[in-house]
């Protein structure tokens, strides 16, 4: 197994984002850009990770160290170009590895297959490998200049001749180096340019002039898309969502209108699930086979059991665990609750901090009153209980198996199993009084 060091460049401020948040910490699918990159790097078998930080270093380091263990952190104190940024990780380079993989922290759509292709070229004898792509409109991209089938230089557009600007094979920004030559090549890069910066792209011409084996690997354009402003963030997120929906549908998930469904990076959906339009999956959602997620539902931090039915217009909040065949209907909210098999909460209810047994029916308009202004309290409802409509269940509370709560009740005391509880005032009916009431109200109206 070849050893590999990956250096992730994450020092840029990203002024075009017009945000105080470092660019690499903006999110797609609920995960920071840099974490998407690191995830693919790990899948590509990288053994060592170095991250070069700069603007917002403290925040970037916190996110990286929370996401991955044993990352080496280096700070680029001056912004003197991409090669200078890579050399900020000199100590990591000096350790010596077979492969050095250099990627940017703002390219969240890179896939492990592309990284593995670059590494395969190194294993096959290459010394420098560049990721390239074919651009329909190459404006703004560096061009890859080849001679006799060999890559000899990367020409930035501002330096390109009219003939070179016609080239459509462009620099994708990802670079792989033979660890034997990586440090020496980087140290030979100069700053003889208008900006007095050290450009990483110069490494290609230096390596070519030294007779080293320089190659290019063509990768899909969407793999190397960088994020520089909020519109590009939206575009990257849209492409990620399309990939996720495609993968799910190919695995056996039915998505009726995929362009209206939003997934998070960790969303898990088993084959046989059906998802209707306009559904949002926040972080930490797992949906088991046979479940149906109806339109306009919002799920986060929830587990949905086999053959469950959610929505339409339902909200599942963190800590929700639904067993098989549970039904959560329209305009219901469930938070931090375990709900047993085949139980139903069909209409207009709030259930929070609860443990509900199997085959329980929760009537329309029922709410758990779980917060006293200082603390949350728990309610437990046993199997086969029936909760009538428009009931208020004041926690802490225990309702036993098979118990029946009359509609409109306010329940403040525990209810033993197989009991009936009524918590409302007795109805008073005055026969024929409606006519007298109307006459009195009418007379009062005429006096005005």
Curated annotation (Swiss-Prot):
Binding residues for UDP-N-acetyl-alpha-D-glucosamine: 9-12, 23, 76, 81-82, 142, 156, 171, 228, 317, 335, 350, 361
Cofactor annotation comment: Binds 1 Mg(2+) ion per subunit.
GO molecular function, one term: UDP-N-acetylglucosamine diphosphorylase activity
Record-level GO BP terms: cell morphogenesis; cell wall organization; lipid A biosynthetic process; peptidoglycan biosynthetic process; regulation of cell shape; UDP-N-acetylglucosamine biosynthetic process
This protein's UniProt keywords: Acyltransferase, Cell shape, Cell wall biogenesis/degradation, Cytoplasm, Magnesium, Metal-binding, Multifunctional enzyme, Nucleotidyltransferase, Peptidoglycan synthesis, Repeat, Transferase
Intracellular or extracellular location(s): Cytoplasm
Matches recorded under Pfam families: Hexapep (PF00132), NTP_transf_3 (PF12804)
Region entry Pyrophosphorylase, spans: 1-230
Gene3D superfamilies the record matches: Hexapeptide repeat proteins, Spore Coat Polysaccharide Biosynthesis Protein SpsA, Chain A
Region (Linker): 231-251
Domain of life: Bacteria
Record-listed Mg(2+) binding positions: 106, 228
Reaction(s) catalysed (UniProt annotation): alpha-D-glucosamine 1-phosphate + acetyl-CoA = N-acetyl-alpha-D-glucosamine 1-phosphate + CoA + H(+); N-acetyl-alpha-D-glucosamine 1-phosphate + UTP + H(+) = UDP-N-acetyl-alpha-D-glucosamine + diphosphate
Region N-acetyltransferase, annotated ranges: 252-448
Cross-referenced InterPro entries: Bifunctional_GlmU, GlmU-like, GlmU_C_LbH, Hexapep, Hexapep_transf_CS, MobA-like_NTP_Trfase, Nucleotide-diphossugar_trans, Trimer_LpxA-like_sf
Residues the record marks as active site: 347 (proton acceptor)
Binding site for acetyl-CoA: 364, 370-371, 389, 407, 424
Enzyme Commission number(s) of this protein: 2.7.7.23, 2.3.1.157
Task performed by this protein: Catalyzes the last two sequential reactions in the de novo biosynthetic pathway for UDP-N-acetylglucosamine (UDP-GlcNAc). The C-terminal domain catalyzes the transfer of acetyl group from acetyl coenzyme A to glucosamine-1-phosphate (GlcN-1-P) to produce N-acetylglucosamine-1-phosphate (GlcNAc-1-P), which is converted into UDP-GlcNAc by the transfer of uridine 5-monophosphate (from uridine 5-triphosphate), a reaction catalyzed by the N-terminal domain.
Record note on quaternary structure: Homotrimer.
Family label: In the N-terminal section; belongs to the N-acetylglucosamine-1-phosphate uridyltransferase family.
NCBIfam families per record: glmU (TIGR01173), PRK14353.1 (NF010933)
Name recorded for this polypeptide: Bifunctional protein GlmU
Source organism: Bartonella henselae (strain ATCC 49882 / DSM 28221 / CCUG 30454 / Houston 1)
